[in-house]
Amino acid sequence: MAKILMTGTSGAFGTLAAQAALKAGHQLAAAMREPDGRNAPAAAALRALGATVVEIDVIDDHSVARGTEAAIAALGGLDVLVNIAGVGTHGLSEGYSSAQLMRVFDLNVVGVHRMMRAVLPTLRAQQTGLVINISSLLGRLSLPFYGPYSATKFALETLSDTYRAEVSQFGVDVVLVEPGGFKTSWIDALVRPEDTERLSGYGQFADVPAQTLTQVEAMLDTRPEQDPAKVAEAVLMLIDTPAGARPQRTVVDFIGMAEPVSMMNDLATQATAGVYQAFGSDELLTLKLR
């Protein structure tokens, strides 16, 4: 059974993925902010299932270092890092202040980088390991009103691909999960643009983002197959798949976006292989197994 450190376990996807991992018999260090404060109920529920709960705020270098060290000590090692912590955005892009945009990037992109830097020395030293980064279909295509969020996921995709090549020869696998839209508490926590004065220049069009989000939520209510538990199942599948056999990207969507994004992924894989071969670096695309 794998020794797993998972971030964002107080949120919807994180809670489901943590529960799935524990029920499958894996050892889990469940990371979250304020496990003795506002997230105490989530922490208690995971402890009851057998998890070790560690406090990690992925936007704080010291918190990441302390929490990761505590997790590895509690687990007696580490096999898998699952990066789930993140935040969504919805609204007109111009209405987001520079500070808002920087905060979203700090959490969704730099936070993943912090976590990977914290665990990679351990994984590289043992010449084996797995990192699963939760991205989004909006990291492969763009839709209006999700600009800052989508930008972070495009960045995460590139960061993950680069890491994947750079650590492949140390036996460390880096893969992505790309969920579509799911109706979870994540929607309630979406970051909205704070510059209302700037948005006033859009007139009635400033109301369109809220209207479209209402339509999306109504649509999701009619699509029970778009179950967030499917994302947790995808994470568990990747953990249980042998090294060298895992897909680089796993799309999780059941409302029509999976096929076109999967086609884009296949084309990107082919193009990337050609570029790496042209530069004589194609061996980096193959995971080195012990």
Question: Which role fits each region the language model picked out?
Answer:
Residues 169-246:
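SDR active-site lid
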Residues 10-11:
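Conserved glycine-rich cofactor-binding loop
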Residues 24-40:
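Conserved glycine-rich Rossmann-like NAD(P)H-binding loop of the short-chain dehydrogenase/reductase
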Residues 47-62:
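Rossmann-fold cofactor-recognition segment
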Residues 92-93, 100-102:
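Substrate-binding pocket helix/loop in short-chain dehydrogenase/reductase
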Residues 136:
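Residue(s) in the substrate-gating loop at a strand-loop-helix junction
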Residues 116, 152:
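Active-site helix of classical SDR
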